[in-house]
C-alpha cells in the first residue's frame, strides 16, 4: 500500500503557522521596544515632602489631633464680644452648648485665621416660631472685618419647611450663592457645617488679587462647591472687597424675635 502526502497542503499549513508565530514575536518585540523608549517610572515618583501624620478623631465630627478647639463645651475662653472686647463673651453657656443671648450682639474668636478647615454644629430649637428670615436666623462670618456683622456670611436659618428667598436660605453664601441642596434637619435636631475656607488675597495697592473661595457641606451634603465670593456680605446693594489680612470667625446674634439657636463642637484646622 502506497502512502500519498499532499505536499502542497502540508507546505501551506506550515507556512501559515510560521507566519502567525513570526507575527506574534514581532508584536512582542515591538511592545518591549516601545516600553524601552518610555521614561522610567521612577522619574514620576515624588517622595518629599512627606505629609504630616494627623490622628483622626475616634468619632466622626470630633476634632482631629491637630485641630484648634474653639469650643469644647466647657468655657468660652476662645471667644469675645466685639461690643466689649476686654470682657467675656456674653452668650449663655450651659450643658456643654452655647446659646445666643438675644440683644448682646455677636461673639467672635479671639484668634485670627487665614485658610482653614472648619467644623461647627448648631441646633434650631424645637419650639421655634416665626417664618422666613425671622425663624432661627444666625450666621457664620468668615474673616470678620469689623465690630458688627461684617465679613463673608454662611447663612444659619431654619430651612425645614420654611420658605424664604433662596440666596438667603440655610446653606447660602448670603445674597451671593444659592445652595446646591437643602439638607436641613427638623428643628430640635443637631446639624453640622463642614467648611473649607480660602481667604482672599490683595495686592500692595489694596486691589483684589484673588477672591475668597468656600466649600460647604451641610449635614454631610455638598451645598457650596469651591465657589468664588464676590465680596463682603451686604444686606443692600452689591458686595465688594476691602483689603484685610487674617480675620476672626464671628457668630451672629441676628435680632429677630424667634427663639435663640445653640452651637457646640466648634473646631478649626489651619491650612498652610
Task: Identify the role of each PLM range.
Residues 1-34:
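Bacterial Sec-dependent N-terminal signal peptides
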Residues 32-272:
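Carbohydrate-interacting regions of secretory-pathway proteins
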Amino acid at each position: 500500500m502506497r502512502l500519498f502526502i499532499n505536499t502542497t497542503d502540508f507546505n501551506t499549513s506550515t507556512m501559515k503557522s510560521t507566519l502567525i508565530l513570526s507575527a506574534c514575536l514581532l508584536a512582542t518585540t515591538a511592545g518591549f521596544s516601545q516600553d524601552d523608549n518610555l521614561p522610567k517610572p521612577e522619574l514620576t515618583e515624588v517622595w518629599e515632602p512627606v505629609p504630616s501624620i494627623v490622628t483622626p478623631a475616634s468619632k466622626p465630627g470630633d476634632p482631629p489631633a491637630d485641630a484648634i478647639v474653639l469650643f469644647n463645651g466647657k468655657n468660652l475662653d476662645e471667644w469675645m464680644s466685639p461690643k466689649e472686647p476686654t470682657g467675656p463673651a456674653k452668650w449663655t453657656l450651659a450643658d456643654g452648648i452655647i446659646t445666643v443671648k438675644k440683644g448682646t450682639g455677636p461673639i467672635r474668636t479671639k484668634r485670627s485665621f487665614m485658610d482653614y478647615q472648619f467644623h461647627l454644629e448648631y441646633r434650631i430649637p424645637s419650639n421655634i416660631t416665626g417664618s422666613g428670615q425671622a425663624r432661627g436666623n444666625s450666621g457664620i462670618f468668615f474673616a470678620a472685618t469689623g465690630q458688627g456683622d461684617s465679613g463673608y456670611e454662611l447663612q444659619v436659618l431654619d430651612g425645614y419647611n420654611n420658605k424664604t428667598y433662596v440666596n438667603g436660605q440655610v446653606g447660602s453664601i448670603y445674597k451671593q450663592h444659592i445652595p446646591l441642596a437643602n439638607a436641613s434637619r427638623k428643628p430640635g435636631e443637631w446639624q453640622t457645617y463642614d467648611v473649607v475656607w480660602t481667604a482672599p488675597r490683595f495686592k500692595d495697592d489694596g486691589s483684589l488679587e484673588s477672591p475668597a473661595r468656600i466649600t460647604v457641606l451641610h449635614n454631610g451634603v455638598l451645598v457650596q462647591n469651591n465657589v468664588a465670593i464676590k465680596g463682603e456680605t451686604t444686606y443692600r446693594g452689591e458686595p465688594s472687597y476691602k483689603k484685610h489680612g487674617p480675620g476672626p470667625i464671628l457668630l451672629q446674634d441676628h435680632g429677630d424675635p424667634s427663639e435663640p439657636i445653640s452651637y457646640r463642637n466648634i473646631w478649626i484646622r489651619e491650612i498652610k
